[in-house]
Amino acid sequence: MKFKGYLIRESEGNFNGSIEDIDIPKLEQGRVLIKVHYSSLNYKDALAASGAKGVASSYPFVPGIDVAGEIIESSTPDFSVGDNVIATGYKIGMSEFGGFGEIVHLPSNWVIKMPSELDHIKCMSFGTAGITAAACIKKIVDGDCSKKLPVLVSGSTGGVGSISVGILSKIGYEVHAISGKSSQIDTLKMMGANKILDRNEYMSDPIKPMDKAQYSAAVDTVGGDILSKMLTMIANHGVVSCCGN
């Protein structure tokens, strides 16, 4: 039996992908076979497809670090055939064939049952970027950061940044979004940003050891000087959630 997958092959330092027929693996103890309904496209998937070192462990390889689907075979009592599930992170799309194929064969402890409030496509609409944004925002919420001051988001047109803007706005924060893309101003406002800060203007003044406390919290997806400046502008007992490579 075979399934179709987007297989990346390497030849003399060149990496190329195509849809190929791949053998369905025999179910191993402690693992499950999942029929993939949806995946999502992440930066790490592009790295794997282009042969970036430290991502895929070997080639040929199927990328796709996010999976939403249903169990078609299980070797563990934790899952039954027909269960709707999600898998993300761990080594999916790195040392294990990922979600850009019809079937994945994963350790059962990498898999969770899909919440009944969601469906496969909704889960993958958020994907790894959404999970990362949610983890950042949970730290802000757990820190009981005041809503009297705005929150700051860097990299706001990227996956994590844009979802952070939307969630923070939805839960009642005033959101200031840093962006270098003037063409995306209307999109950011639509997602909930109250103020757009041009990245070059934001960085135009020298970074001080301590600046005026302007924000109760921040989500940073960029690092470097942007993060350095951000840290000087956070009020006492504030939270800065950082993520990225």
Report each predicted region and the residues it spans.
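Glycine-rich beta-strand-centered segment in the early N-terminal region that forms part
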Residues: D23-L41, A52-I92, G98
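Short amphipathic alpha-helix with an adjacent loop that forms part of the alpha/beta core around
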Residues: Y202-A213
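Short, well-ordered loop/turn sites that connect or cap secondary structure elements
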Residues: D78-F79, C145, I234
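N-terminal Rossmann-like NAD(P) cofactor-binding module of classical short-chain dehydrogenase/reductase
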Residues: I86, S216-V219, S241
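Short glycine-centered segments of the SAM/dcSAM-binding site in methyltransferase folds
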Residues: N84, P150, G238-V239
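Mid-domain Rossmann-like dinucleotide-binding core that forms the NAD(H)/NADP(H) cofactor-binding site
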Residues: M124-E201
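Short glycine/proline-centered loop/turn elements that form peptide/ligand docking sites
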Residues: S74, M94, A177-T187, G224-I226
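Glycine-rich phosphate-binding loop and adjacent beta-alpha segment
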Residues: V222-N245
